[in-house]
């Protein structure tokens, strides 16, 4: 778990004022590797932060995404979640249980894409879908 003082520094370095709510939301996303949705973050923090609204959570997460502190994952059109790990990695979503797992990328997967000459790539995300080992064993 990252120290709260370190998280506060990260917000300040990104030009974000570290209010109590912002710091709590950032700490939650960085420390929970479950790829939470905005609703999950809100449900987890609303009792701790009495004045927290769902709108505040959405706006704060957007602020973090825009600052490059958090990744927005849009694995399909209906599901949006957040990842506090901004390093290069892939995501696997189980079609059965819905769990999202981080996967290491052994090489530059963009090198496998033909025709990128002249393009400036600002972001690339690799999503894999299928059945996870746990669900596969159950069936």
Language model: regions and residue ranges:
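Short, Lys/Arg-enriched N-terminal segment that forms or immediately precedes the first helix
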Residues: 2-15
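Non-DNA-binding regulatory cores of transcription-related proteins
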Residues: 66-139
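A short acidic, leucine-rich amphipathic alpha-helix
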Residues: 40-46, 57
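Pre-recognition alpha-helix immediately N-terminal to the DNA-recognition helix
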Residues: 23-28, 40
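Short amphipathic alpha-helical elements of helix-turn-helix/winged-helix folds
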Residues: 10, 27-32, 44
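Basic amphipathic alpha-helical segments that dock to polyanions
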Residues: 57-67
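Short capping segments at the starts of secondary-structure elements
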Residues: 18-20, 32-37
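Short coil turns linking two alpha-helices in DNA-binding domains
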Residues: 37, 53-54
